[in-house]
């Protein structure tokens, strides 16, 4: 799957109301990368992340619409890469409550989730301990 297809599928699954076009979504991703965010591709998923403190990153998952099992596997591989790079914790904000259940299935990592009131994209926060 191409990056454009990953973005298109994520857009359909997570923003079905048409609030963003594919071009706007891709431009937002490009801007984020130009402003210091980093990207890891794992299969048909992208993990976009930035440092928020020493050894801690904030990450956002862009999923190409794969099955939950494949998605967990892709996310696990990306998190293992961050662990190898020296990160101790990854914080993942999101809106869909179901995502907490997916994250809780990550093998070997300690995962805690809390409800926030931080606006769009920040209803929940899951912290994944990598070390």
Which residues make up each language-model segment?
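Short acidic/polar active-site loop segments enriched in Thr and Asp
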Residues: 88
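Conserved acetyl-CoA-binding loop-helix of GNAT-fold acetyltransferases
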Residues: 67-84
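A short helix-loop-beta-strand connector motif used in the catalytic cores of GNAT acetyltransferases and
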Residues: 27-45
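Conserved acetyl-CoA binding element of GNAT-fold acetyltransferases
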Residues: 52-66
